[in-house]
Amino acid sequence: MNKQWTIIFALIFTLIVAIFAVINVRSVEVDYLFGRSEWPLILVILGSVLMGALIVFSVGIFQVMKLKREIKTLRKENRTAIHKQEDTHLADQTDTQDASAMIEKKD
């Protein structure tokens, strides 16, 4: 359901940007570090939206990679803790069995 809402919001946002871009079709002057040029406002708007989406996508990918690394570390720690717990449990059982065997030998 969450993915459906994401798609719906993305479509609404795309529609709003498209309408806004189509309404603003005149040329505008764009200043670069090395010069100036005239561009249709629709291209400036769409280029800005695409650059913003690229930045958000890059940050999102970085966050996902960071979380995957953290999950891998936590799973490794979890496995280590489980093995230690099993070893402790087996040692306790062995001690109990040894103690029971010693008591039976004394009797």
From Swiss-Prot:
Listed Pfam families: LapA_dom
Question: InterPro entries, from UniProt?
Answer: LapA_dom
Could you tell me which residues belong to the region Disordered?
Answer: 82-107
Gene Ontology annotations for the cellular component aspect, listed alphabetically: plasma membrane
Its localization reads:
Cell membrane
Q: What are the record keywords, sorted?
A: Cell membrane, Membrane, Transmembrane, Transmembrane helix
Q: Which residues cross the membrane?
A: 5-25, 42-62
Q: Where is this chain primarily localised?
A: membrane
User: Which regions are flagged for Basic and acidic residues bias?
Assistant: 82-92
All disulfide bonds of the chain are none
Organism domain of life: Bacteria
Membrane topology per the entry is: Multi-pass membrane protein
Protein name, please?
Answer: Uncharacterized protein YrvD
Q: Which organism is it from?
A: Bacillus subtilis (strain 168)
Lineage, opening ranks:
Bacteria, Bacillati, Bacillota, Bacilli, Bacillales
Gene encoding this polypeptide?
yrvD
